[in-house]
Amino acid sequence: MASPFVEVPVDTPTGERVIKVTNPDRTYFAGLPEGRGRKIDLVEYYLAVADGVVRGLRERPTVLKRHPEGADGEAIYTKRVPNSRPPWIETATVHFPSGRSATELCPVDVAHVAWAVQMSTLDFHPWPSRRVDTESPDELRIDLDPMPGSGWAQVQEVALEVKVVFDGLGMTSFPKTSGSKGIHVYLRTRPGWTFTDLRHCALAVAREVERRRPDLATSKWWKEERGERVFLDFNRMARDQTIASAYSVRARPLATVSAPLAWEEVPDCEVADFDIWTMRDRYARLGDVHAAIDVVAHDLSPLLELYDRQGEGEAPYPPQFPKMEGEPLRVQPSRARRPTAT
């Protein structure tokens, strides 16, 4: 028997697309009442926030985080779009240090988003660079990740300290909830910088925030050194590392989303305030509160100068990376300190 389906018309700048949504009543979220959080609900949510979600994805190679068994099932990170894709689907080819390459989805309109949701995509993980030059990122991302023993209140405080650092350099930054436990802070950058440059900028911010608030924040890569603090994950700016885009639905029990915020909202908001229904209402009232994110693109020289002044040099890369130039020994400190047996 053929799977049930509905056809959803989607308006785009190049004409109407029709997305065939199979099994529209399939549910994804165990924490919701029966019949809530269906595939069709996801499609309708993304259509309702179309301009906002596309603003974060447009022309960016994008990894799809798919959950065909539901939000609590195993995630499938899809870097290669299927050959059976419609002819209008846009793609971008990216290359990895291993020498391999992948043809990734490159959304240019909300029909691309709806097509991906049909494949059980919940959230979208775009590169911080665009198709025209994938090796030149234009988006600095600061990822705040609370360690066990720290919580949302600490994340909020650290986010506001990140804002102080950027404000002090005359830079306009944009916060959003991660939709899970943390906060992401974005900054648009001028073209011409490398992934190494942006990672150094993220590392400079992390170290500066830790210097200001050592009780709350840490830039330490090794978990054993972080304590019960909020980790500013500078390695999210390493090449081929991504985070969930603005408006992405997260694989959480209550269908929470990564919610763009105005800075004045950060002290009083909660992650649970924003799900696929409340965000639709909010978007209808306020539109995209990050609509101005592309207005100003920043020169990163002040952040790179801060990195140099700090004088701490490189920090470890994630384990899947080859040894990088200037990187310290990639060994956790407790092991490095072990005395040699005699």
Regions found by a protein language model. Give the residues of each.
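Beta-sheet entry/capping signal
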Residues: 18, 61-63, 74, 172, ...
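Class II aminoacyl-tRNA synthetase-like tRNA-binding/catalytic domains
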Residues: 76, 84-115
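C-terminal accessory nucleic-acid interaction domains of nucleic acid-metabolism proteins
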Residues: 1-44, 51-54, 58, 101, ...
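Polyanion/phosphate-binding surface patch
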Residues: 60-92
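Signature for HUH/AEP ssDNA processing cores
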Residues: 105-178, 189-197, 342
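A short beta-strand motif that forms the metal-chelation/ATP-contact edge
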Residues: 184-190, 231-234
